[in-house]
Amino acid sequence: MKIVVNVCYGGFSLSQEAEDFLMEKYGINSRVDRSDYRLVNCVETLGGSVAGGKFSVLGIIEIPDDVEWEIEEYDGYEHVVEKHRSWHYERK
């Protein structure tokens, strides 16, 4: 499962380009689950810097499909956690 998170301090938001992409390609607004394939496709297509809003750079974390997860954040920098494990975005 792929999950979109904010990978810088500031907080999750989408750029106008990302909003337009989601509306034009899928006819939806940005209020979708972070694991929604359409949001994931948007970030993969545009890139995290373009898809992220003014104080946001977006990344994709991939976790096993059977994991119950949630997003935690510190000053807007997000990561995905399970009760006893966590995954962080790795810059490539």
Task: Please annotate each region the language model reported.
Residues 1-72, 76-92:
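Catalytic phosphate/metal-binding cores of nucleic-acid and nucleotide-processing enzymes, i.e., regions
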